[in-house]
Amino acid sequence: MQNSKKVIVGISGGVDSSVCALMLKTAGFDVQGVFMKNWTNSAPNIECTTEKDFADAEAVCDQIGIPLHQANFSGDYWDRVFKKFLSDHNEGLTPNPDILCNKEIKFRSFLDYCLEIGADYIATGHYVRVDNSGSSARLLRGIDPTKDQSYFLHQVTGKDLAKSLFPLGELTKEQVRQIAKDNKLITSEKKDSVGICFIGKNKYNDFIANFLGKDPGVILDEEGNELGVHDGLMYFTLGQRQGIGLGGIKGKEQDSWYVAHKDTQSKALTVVQGRDHPLLFSDGCYVDNVQWVNENNEDELNCEVQIRYQSQPVKALLKKLTDGYKIIFASPQLAVTPGQSAVIYKGDDCLGGSVIKDRISSDFYSWADNRGYNYQVYG
């Protein structure tokens, strides 16, 4: 039965968006595809897969029998996503640009573009669900816990979710692959893209070095002993083990080194040994004002919080402050990282989230006081 509703699918050239488009066409929707160009290829020494992905998108849309258009949002991406990505790194943060890309590009630039050309809905291959049974659309986890992407969509409003379709949210990745194989889609065996979209196959630090250069400082142990030098705090994140470059220090060979603190004033990088070191754990965190999927006026909320993609959610208490919120975890969490997002859940219901401003840790505060490092406690 033909459905008169027009749906525009974001086609990336991967298996997920391919199956998304196929399922909607099979359901009778009037389906068209749009390939989004969000990144410019002009940056030096950077390998980009846009041309290959577009060729795959064209081929799979031909197979499915839907038209494919191109839309160039690279200017929006540069101004609203990438510039902030670089400035956050310069401030010693560890940003997650994919979250901002969803908010600013896929559910702003792309959504506006599609509505302007007559779409009733947009659709993407994200593994999430939307519940439209109430007065406002709710964002729910996808049923496949290994692929759930609600963490990345927590800044999308209920108003915009109501205009969005996510058919893969009810499927596992294995089922999606099988649908692609059963229909002989050319993307059925294509590997999933991993990591940040614009970095592609490039090494993370090599990529950002093209834009940020070097800002060297010293590497210290927790007592303040100098162990080496680094090229810039922006190349490290809290809890990081690989790439510190401290192998073979005499008398300290027994355990791996982990990043425990980045001091932006002195440019010192403090590292500790052992993944269970107290300086790596936090009792909670401070976040900016929460971006709620739907309006929430509670000053306190018992919830679950997820502090990185695919990490286990932890029970927590969210408390409103004069400037943002405080989150207290039910148990200490490893590598709570400023710049990353703390996303708030009630079961499968994703309520919203915010960027982590700072950690809450009595062990860290005592150590910082002894070392003379500044930190902020919000009230």
Regions found by a protein language model. Give the residues of each.
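ATP-dependent adenylation/nucleotidyltransferase module used to activate substrates
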Residues: 1-154, 165, 174, 259, ...
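AMP-forming adenylation/ATP pyrophosphatase catalytic core
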Residues: 12, 41, 123-379
